[in-house]
Design a protein with these regions (language model features):
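Cofactor-binding active-site loop characterized by glycine-rich and histidine/acidic residues
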Residues: 2-122, 140-146, 151, 155
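A positional/architectural concept
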Residues: 126-128
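Thiamine diphosphate
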Residues: 130-169
């Protein structure tokens, strides 16, 4: 059910240089970044021909060649890593952008807010994408989040034309 979010993101990316990092629900993103679907399936089945030689499994699909830096089993663990990838690109003079996906459950992690602060302070080339289904581990987001003042753009992932207005800048 996350394919629409990816489709909009890919439309805004330059696949020859931009990077992506995500959470543990990461089966479709590597394929969108150009990873062979057979390698993704091999990883899911624990085969040596998988993206991580069958050792990463469902949560840890990875392809440096395709600038896909994997899924991560720690809730919100990919958020500071995404900023770190963007910092590296900025430091080395690259104009690549890193897309960092996270779920609404990760929005209550302290590392998210610390990372947002550093990303804004250092003007990092990173776009944080919250895939918000409205419930984080059975808790409505209105009960535990107050993020309305953060700079953001809302995008309906089902409306492909809406993604054009949210194009990465």
């Amino acid at each position: 059910g996350q394919e629409a979010v990816l489709a909009g993101s890919l439309h805004a990316m330059d696949l020859s240089k931009d990077r992506m990092i995500t959470a543990y629900r990461n089966h479709v993103q590597p394929i969108g970044m150009g990873v062979d679907p057979k390698k993704v399936m091999a990883e899911l089945y624990g085969k040596e021909t998988g993206t991580s030689m069958g050792l990463g499994g469902s949560m840890h699909i990875f392809s440096k060649e395709h600038r896909f830096y994997g899924g991560h089993g720690i809730v919100g663990g990919q958020i500071p890593l995404g900023a770190g990838i963007a910092f590296g690109d900025k430091y080395h003079g690259s104009d690549a952008v890193t897309l960092c996906y996270f779920g609404d459950g990760a929005a209550r992690q302290g590392s998210l807010h610390e990372t947002f602060n550093l990303a804004m302070l250092w003007k990092l080339p990173v776009v944080f994408i919250c895939e918000n289904n409205g419930y984080a581990e059975a808790t409505a987001t209105d009960w535990h989040l107050n993020t309305k003042n953060l700079p953001h753009k809302h995008s309906n992932s089902i409306n492909l034309f809406n993604h054009e207005s949210s194009k990465i800048q």
